[in-house]
Amino acid sequence: EVKNAFEVYEHLLEMNPYSRKDMLKAHKMLMHDLTKEAGAFRQGGVGVFAGKRLVHMAPPAERVPQLVKELMDWVKKDPAHPLIKSSVFHYEFEFIHPFADGNGRMGRMWQTLLLYQWKPIFGWLPIETLIRERQEEYYRVLGEADHKADSRVFIEFLLQAIYDTLVEVESTEQVRVQVSEQVQRLLDALENDTLTTK
């Protein structure tokens, strides 16, 4: 799995975040030799479990291609701030759960790709690592958002993780010299921007 992840990351920033073909290609690389459904949308029902308790039942498999297309169209065209759009995309992607396996990592990677399209610095920030370090909270807020049918708590969690990553990178001496101006502008935007579409 680690070898596969490295291969995806080698090619991720060359991919089009609005292309289902590229998404399927990334999934095929990520899940190569791990599942028979690598590189294909799931064919059956799938649920997300916390232990033995079902916390989310994903939409029917036959709806997945259209739901993913609609989500990609929305994220491409909506005028919302890219930080908000990428976070909403991540939530909706996990809600759709388009693959039999690998949805969490794909959602995090695709959010990174969307953010990279906005500001290339995001291609080099360890946001996914920070989210993985907070995996228990990640799944808790994802479940809470799903239960309430309100994605705000999940979006707030992701925005905080992005902010924390930027602060961590900005405070690292070696990296500060290379990216401090870009990171500082992003931090300023996060602190000063209301992140609305207006």
Predicted features and spans:
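FIC/Doc superfamily catalytic core
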Residues: E1-K198
